[in-house]
Curated annotation (Swiss-Prot):
Taxonomy of the source species: Viruses, Riboviria, Orthornavirae, Negarnaviricota, Polyploviricotina
Cellular localization per UniProt: Host nucleus; Host cytoplasm
Function: Inhibits post-transcriptional processing of cellular pre-mRNA, by binding and inhibiting two cellular proteins that are required for the 3'-end processing of cellular pre-mRNAs: the 30 kDa cleavage and polyadenylation specificity factor/CPSF4 and the poly(A)-binding protein 2/PABPN1. In turn, unprocessed 3' end pre-mRNAs accumulate in the host nucleus and are no longer exported to the cytoplasm. Cellular protein synthesis is thereby shut off very early after virus infection.
One example of a Gene Ontology biological process annotation: symbiont-mediated suppression of host gene expression
Region spans: RNA-binding and homodimerization: 1-73
Source organism superkingdom: Viruses
Keyword annotations: Eukaryotic host gene expression shutoff by virus, Host cytoplasm, Host gene expression shutoff by virus, Host mRNA suppression by virus, Host nucleus, Host-virus interaction, Inhibition of host innate immune response by virus, Inhibition of host interferon signaling pathway by virus, Inhibition of host PKR by virus, Inhibition of host pre-mRNA processing by virus, Inhibition of host RIG-I by virus, Inhibition of host RLR pathway by virus, Interferon antiviral system evasion, RNA-binding, Ubl conjugation, Viral immunoevasion
Name of the protein in its database record: Non-structural protein 1
Binding partners and assembly: Homodimer. Interacts with host TRIM25 (via coiled coil); this interaction specifically inhibits TRIM25 multimerization and TRIM25-mediated RIGI CARD ubiquitination. Interacts with human EIF2AK2/PKR, CPSF4, IVNS1ABP and PABPN1.
Gene it is expressed from: NS
Gene3D superfamilies per UniProt: Influenza virus non-structural protein, effector domain (3.30.420.330), S15/NS1, RNA-binding (1.10.287.10)
Length: 230
């Protein structure tokens, strides 16, 4: 097993522990608590994949961080802070919308890279809006936290989420996954719209109705792909 993979997991475990202690003092806001909950699931998945104990990894991560901080200079800290200042966390959904359980009458699922796409293909003739919570750096989508498809009545009918055991994805991965989800929903004559933040950072171009501008041929291809693969 690669040593960098192990040490990265150890540091992530310790930093999660620090953030958990912060949250236990009721100091974290909703986005902070949401990331904490999802990172916990991710760490459990990674620990299982790597065969590493989280408690032991947390102790080892603490030692690594302490060694780094002992050598940290003020100038290096300033440079790190400057790079972080460009990172933003954008939220279309409330914490309740993100944590709400939902059920599918005709469940369909597809794994695309490190992203899992789920949708209910029993939904027909509805107007659906895609909402997402994600981080942005230098005006580009960096990490998708969660994307969900809602009907006008507020029901959840689709979702794109990172797989805890396969961390890491690009903005193109997210765009492709959104295309698959839209294609699957449109197959049943649903009208799909995209939130303003997703239009700005995930699609870059859209029509006036908030719908991604995809050629009809590409729409049909996505729908067929979803029907056969999801």
């Amino acid at each position: 097993m690669d040593s960098n993979t192990v040490s990265s997991f150890q540091v992530d475990c310790f930093l999660w522990h620090v953030r958990k202690r912060f949250a236990d003092q009721e100091l974290g806001d909703a986005p902070f608590l949401d990331r904490l909950r999802r990172d916990q699931k991710s760490l459990r998945g990674r620990g299982s994949t790597l065969g590493l104990d989280i408690e032991t990894a947390t102790r080892a991560g603490k030692q690594i961080v302490e060694r780094i901080l002992e050598k940290e200079s003020d100038e290096a800290l300033k440079m790190t802070i400057a790079s972080l200042s460009a990172l933003r966390y954008l939220t279309d959904m409330t914490l309740e919308e993100m944590s709400r359980d939902w059920f599918m009458l005709m469940p369909k699922q597809k794994v695309a890279g490190s992203l899992c796409i789920r949708m209910d293909q029993a939904i027909m003739d509805k107007t659906i809006i895609l909402k997402a919570n994600f981080s942005v750096i230098f005006d580009r989508l960096e990490t998708l936290i969660l994307l969900r498809a809602f009907t006008e009545e507020g029901a959840i009918v689709g979702e794109i989420s990172p797989l805890p055991s396969l961390p890491g994805h690009t903005d193109e991965d997210v765009k492709n996954a959104i295309g698959v989800l839209i294609g699957g929903l449109e197959w049943n004559d649903n009208t799909v719209r995209v939130s303003e933040t997703l239009q700005r950072f995930a699609w870059r171009s859209s029509n006036e109705g908030g719908r991604p501008s995809l050629p009809p041929k590409q729409k049909r291809k996505m729908a067929r792909t979803t029907e056969s693969e999801v």
